[in-house]
Amino acid sequence: MRVALTYNEKRTASASPDDADAEFDSREAIAAIARLIAELGHPITPIDVSGPIPRLVDELARLTPDVVLNLAEGERGTFREAFYPALIEQLGLVHTGSSASALAVCLDKALAKRVVAGAGVRVPRGRLIRATDDPRLARSAMARVPLPAIVKPNFEGSSKGITAASIARDRAGLADVVADAIARYPHGVLVEELVDGIDVGVGWFAGIGLLPPIGYRYDGEIYDYALKHLTPERVQLEIPPPLSVAVARRLAVTATRAFVALGITGYGRVDLRITPQGDAVFLEMNPLPSLTLAAGHDELYVAAARLGHAPRGVLAAVIDAALPRGQPRQLCA
């Protein structure tokens, strides 16, 4: 089975404070994934999608892959993560992971929260603020958000735009934080109550099921960009974290509801906070979580290993889940 591996190559240093390509993959990370796919017996061709789109279309036409292992995050626009899956779908090829429509919904954090809230999942109280909003209405909306509050970009992932300075404890400070965030992310920022609790991620792979929850322990109030990308050694992973049976069961139910409500297929990871009272609060859905094997960023593989699945088997599950969804090798001109 011929596999094309689409991705965006990271151009900056892995520990760069610039978050422009924080979601992209290094050559080393892609090479490690490609080696495992080759060990499964599949000829694989990595393709850096950065650059002219016609070049990518021509390359896919030449390869006629049976499946596209898509890790591309996209570079521009509020729905960039959905672009390459949409293109692949329009070319008549199959790709791993969720559909373009599911990716588009999940990248809009405010919309994703409305969807899961409709499925009975608790979400933080908050408001979406855009650069084009009427200032008076924006101030009124922010005034209804409980303090302390956190301000985060609505259309970003990988904790981009989230720092210790994203937390506001009074109304004047909140206005300043929002103004700074809007200047950088004019498409919109989420202003939300800062939910007290511990950060937990729950991964899921078709053919494997829910993974043991991943607990993130660190000094500070939030799992921000610096902790995730600059100093990951300061984060302690607990797989699983120490949760009571009742809380663990509640977490699994909440995670499952979120995956189903958002139409996640193939694989994904939902991020939540467990409150001191044991409630699971939805933070965001990552329908395209990192599959890197690099230490400190390989928590999905570590969680899968708790169930007896090696990285090669995890990647096999990702590919196998994509195969029923369409007809391979029907590339449209």
Protein language model regions, located:
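ATP-binding N-terminal substructure of ATP-dependent carboxylate-amine bond-forming enzymes
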Residues: 1-96, 100-101, 105-107, 111, ...
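Phosphate-binding site of ATP-dependent enzymes
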Residues: 170-253, 274-281
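Active-site nucleotide/adenylate-binding loops and adjacent lid/helix of ATP-dependent enzymes
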Residues: 1-6, 60-64, 104-190, 196, ...
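A short acidic/small-residue loop/turn micro-motif
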Residues: 131, 217-219, 288-290
